[in-house]
Amino acid sequence: MKLSKAIDIFFKCAQVIDEEVCSLLSSYVATLRALYLLHQNHHWEAEDYQHHLLFQRLYESVQASADAAAERVVGLCGKLNDVDMYKLVESFEGDEFVESSLAAEEEFQKLAKTIYAKIKEKKCIDIGA
């Protein structure tokens, strides 16, 4: 993609990024951070080595995604809205580590789809769907 086209797309997107989208994007980052904490807690509390490694890989991959997403959201919105990620962690917690992590990941996917639909509705992006 030519630089001029990329700049045009950026400015088009910047014009449609409103408070609603910024709030959704802040929730996205908060949910990533909550997933990080959840997976890290499960990593520490895992009773067997396989689960210990699984949750370590999960929290390490989520950490990189959360950092990249937060930087982009701050670039678009100027700041992250306050979202209580600790309440999110509590809402994801369960007795079974694997099941609660899967449920949290499913909730994250739903949020990501909601954000994508909202941004697509504003005709800012389209990745062929």
Region spans (language model):
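Phenylalanine-focused residue identity feature
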Residues: 10-11, 49, 55, 92, ...
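Conserved alpha-helical segments that form or flank metal/cofactor-binding pockets of metalloenzymes
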Residues: 49-83
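Charge-dense, intrinsically disordered terminal/linker segments
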Residues: 1-23
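Helix-loop segments that flank and shape redox-cofactor active sites
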Residues: 34-57, 114-127
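Amphipathic, alpha-helical segments enriched in basic
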Residues: 14, 18, 30-37, 44, ...
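Acidic/histidine-rich alpha-helical segments that form the ligand environment
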Residues: 25-28, 85-129
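Generic structural signal for well-ordered, non-transmembrane alpha-helical segments
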Residues: 26-33, 37, 56, 60-67, ...
